Amino acid sequence: MAKVCVVTGKRPISGNNVSHANNRTRRRFYPNLHTHRFWVENENRFVKLKLSAKGLRIIDKKGIDTVLAKIRIRGEKV
């Protein structure tokens, strides 16, 4: 699976490593992703999601049911 958060849509961005001599080489900045398992009460099963730290905070705030509904509206399979 891609390095993308399913809740926030955060994905890698590109930038530069900059040395002391100000030489620049290309690199990628990756989001802080974690695979996390959530118990969904109304479906009576676990759901495994790849989330950024911000995505985890959103689920803590809004609840897993609300977030899963928004993911499914976008057409993603969960």
UniProtKB/Swiss-Prot annotation:
For whether the record's keyword set contains Ribonucleoprotein, the answer is yes
* Keyword Ribosomal protein attributed: yes
Q: Which GO terms describe its biological process?
A: translation
Q: Which UniProt keywords apply?
A: Ribonucleoprotein, Ribosomal protein
List the GO molecular function terms.
structural constituent of ribosome
- Extract the InterPro entries matched here: Ribosomal_bL28 (IPR026569), Ribosomal_bL28/bL31-like_sf (IPR034704), Ribosomal_bL28_bact-type (IPR001383), Ribosomal_bL28_sf (IPR037147)
Question: Which Pfam families does this one have?
Answer: Ribosomal_L28
Q: Which domain of life is it from?
A: Bacteria
Gene3D superfamilies linked: Ribosomal protein L28/L24
Gene Ontology cellular-component terms for this entry are: cytosolic large ribosomal subunit
Regarding protein family, the annotation reads: Belongs to the bacterial ribosomal protein bL28 family.
Protein name according to UniProt: Large ribosomal subunit protein bL28
